[in-house]
Each structure stands twice: as C-alpha cells, then as structure tokens.
Amino acid sequence: MLIELDYPVPLSVELEAAKTLLLIIDMENENAHPAGALYIGEPVRKIIPRIAQLRERIRQAGGRVVHTQSVRSPDALEFAVFKNTVRKLEGTWGAELIDDLKPASDEPLIVKHTHDCFYQTEMDALLTQMELRPGEGRVIVTGISTRNCVQSAVMGFSVRDYHVYVPMDCTAHNDEKQVLQAFSLFTSFGYKHSVTMTRSDLIQLY
C-alpha cells in the first residue's frame, strides 16, 4: 500500500517578540558546510540565509535566540555498543557551528549529547532564567536535521506546553520523505494543538 504525504499549508502568524524564542538547531560544519563529512547539500544551503534573516528580524524586534550544538565523545555508547557512524566528535571542526550562524555574545548555546535538546542539558534552566513560561512562550524551531534533532525539539517543547512554530523553509534533511514524515507527525492529533506549520516570511513580530 502506497501512502502519499503532502507538505502542510504554511500559516501566517503574529508573535509577541518579548515572548518569542528562535531556536537554531545544530547548524554544524559536519552537516552544514560543503567540506563536512556528512554535508546535507542543497537543502541545507538554502536554509542558511533564511535562518540568518529570521534571526536578524527577531533580534531587532526584541526576541531571543538560542543555539544548540550536538557533540559526542569517542567512547559514547552510541558508537561503542550500537556501532552507529562516528560523528560530531567534541572538539573537532565538524562539531563547530558554521561561521554564518555562530552565536552572538548574547545568544546562549546549549550543548547536547543526543538528538534531544532537553536530555541532560541546561535547556530547562535556561527557559526558567529567560522567564519563558509554558502556555505563554513562543518557540520557533529551525535547523537540522528535520527528522532527528528538529523533530525531537518540536516534540520536547510541545509536551512542555509551549507554543511551537516550524518554518518549513528553515529546516533541512537529506531525505525529503523523512521531512514529510516529520511534518506529518507535527500536524497529527498529538501535536497539532500546540505546533503551527509556517514559513519564515509569514512570521510577523510585534
């Protein structure tokens, strides 16, 4: 049986900048730089200027920006036990964020060791420090990759009762089928109450 998935219709949104956070997920050399060992290619090349422009608009409006960086140690169980592809090794060029989207001095960086930006990280503490509260806070999730770390972030913020926005032109993956699977999940019964599919040019801030 063949199941076809379509891209969701992007919605226009108006967000209060003071309650809005732009999350830029794992824009690291390994996947986002042409010299990276696991470079995603054209899909990631396209999103870099879009994220940069959205970031500038959010900063100018008074919103906040947070970055995540996914790193691994050589002896991580993911490699030692489960034999996954060794990647994103801490301290290497591949794990560094790309020059075009490096954090500004006032943009926090959350270092994580799995797809999940909440698991054993400072994310919860940072949200408390920023006074970005469940039920009130607006989180725009961008970056790579759509089916893995972006999906984990969207689900994590949704189950913590934040308003989540996914500009579909600001995430990338190396497999369009998996992009559509992620977007289908975000618009399913379990998440559509708090997740809005949008596009970067349809996000207005006040």
Where are these regions (language model features)?
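A short alpha/beta connector and helix-capping loop motif
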Residues: A18, G36-S70
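Short acidic, glycine/proline-rich loop/turn micro-motifs
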Residues: P34-L38, E78-F82
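Generic enzyme active-site microenvironment
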Residues: I24, T68, P167
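Active-site loop signature of alpha/beta-hydrolase-fold enzymes
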Residues: E30, S73-P74, H173
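Acidic-leg catalytic submotif of subtilisin-like serine proteases
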Residues: L21-A32
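Short acidic/glycine-rich loop or secondary-structure boundary segments that cap or lie
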Residues: P74-F79, F118-Q120
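Short Asp/Glu-rich motifs
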Residues: S70, L77-E78, E176-K177
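Active-site-adjacent betaalpha module
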Residues: M1-L21, R57, T85-Y206
